[in-house]
Amino acid sequence: MKLIPIILNAKNLSGMAGSISICCWIVVFVPQIYENFRRQSAEGLSLLFIVLWLLGDIFNVMGAMMQNLLPTMIILAAYYTLADLILLIQCMWYDKEKKSILQEVKKNVDPVHLPPANPINETVLQDVFNEYEPLLPRIEEEDSQSYSSLELGRTIVVKERENFFNDFLIVSGVLIAGILSWYISYCSGLDNGIPKKKPAFEQINLPAQILGYLSAILYLGSRIPQIVLNFKRKSCEGVSFLFFLFACLGNTSFIISVLSASWLIGSAGTLLMDFTVFIQFFLYAKPKYEKILIDN
């Protein structure tokens, strides 16, 4: 394969954006699936959000097949549906485990009976009189706890910086992979910006277009339950930041590369919804070390 210089025109920029979009959508579900597995919980995710997204992907697959799109596009749509199913299974499985644990706890816990109050005797009065003596080790213990909390807080700050750096590397790697994959096809002559003979006009498949619009509506509406859940909890804990970041990047690059009304509505609309979730991430974000200091 011979390396050739890139001609920066609208077609090549569109192809590059499309390649980046595909790479983002390939990995978009991985961070959230991993987050659920790591926490052994999907409590932060709205079940309705996953269900609506799944229905949108199902209509997307059906529309792509009816419109006779490229096999790669159909395979990608099927892959998204499979990833949705994995998230849905995680939500249902971890919720079932949580309920079973709560039921087990209720069975094993006996009613609490308060013991009768101990009478104040001479020993108690003596302890009160000499209170300054037992307070000394208690003060030292509190100082020790405060110091350990500060140390833990510093450790968490370092860990958060490491996570940010790791996220930056992951996002950069996906973007570079998208550009490189496009450049390989560009050098191979598959996408070199040279005008090709236009294919004959393809008749629009009305049922496929209807499915495309339905898919767009479902994509657009799927974010609303998640936004509402985050608002009620005043937290985005349990939701992967990279999940929505890759969704934003995928939709943004897709909008740049495609000019099809039904799919643009879905991408542009969900992009606005994803930005709303981003605002919630920063609005509800509280440094973990502050929580620890407050608790202690």
UniProtKB/Swiss-Prot annotation:
Keywords: Amino-acid transport, Membrane, Mitochondrion, Repeat, Transmembrane, Transmembrane helix, Transport, Vacuole
Membrane topology reported for the UniProt record: Multi-pass membrane protein
Keyword field contains Mitochondrion: yes
Main localization (coarse): membrane
The PQ-loop domain, residue ranges: 10-76, 208-270
Alphabetized Pfam families for the sequence: PQ-loop
A GO BP entry: basic amino acid transmembrane export from vacuole
Cytoplasmic side: 34-44, 90-163, 221-238, 284-296
UniProt KW Transmembrane helix keyword: yes
All ranges on the Vacuolar side of the membrane: 1-12, 66-68, 185-199, 260-262
Mutant lacking the gene: phenotype: Decreases histidine import into the vacuole. Resistant to fluconazole and caspofungin. Suppresses CDC13-1 temperature sensitivity.
Gene Ontology terms for molecular function: basic amino acid transmembrane transporter activity; L-histidine transmembrane transporter activity
Upregulation: Up-regulated during histidine starvation. Up-regulated by addition of ammonia or amino acids to a nitrogen-depleted medium. Down-regulated by excess lysine.
InterPro entries the UniProt entry points to: LAAT-1 (IPR051415), PQ-loop_rpt (IPR006603)
UniProt subcellular location: Vacuole membrane; Mitochondrion membrane
Domain of life of the organism encoding this protein: Eukaryota
GO cellular component: fungal-type vacuole membrane; membrane; mitochondrial membrane; mitochondrion
Gene3D superfamilies: 1.20.1280.290
TM helices/strands, residue ranges: 13-33, 45-65, 69-89, 164-184, 200-220, 239-259, 263-283
Family to which the UniProt record says this protein belongs: Belongs to the laat-1 family.
Task of the protein: Amino acid transporter that moves histidine into the vacuole. May also contribute to low affinity arginine import into the vacuole. May function as an amino acid/proton antiporter.
PANTHER family, A to Z: SEVEN TRANSMEMBRANE PROTEIN 1-RELATED (PTHR16201), VACUOLAR AMINO ACID TRANSPORTER YPQ1-RELATED (PTHR16201:SF35)
The protein's name: Vacuolar histidine transporter YPQ3
Provenance organism: Saccharomyces cerevisiae (strain ATCC 204508 / S288c)
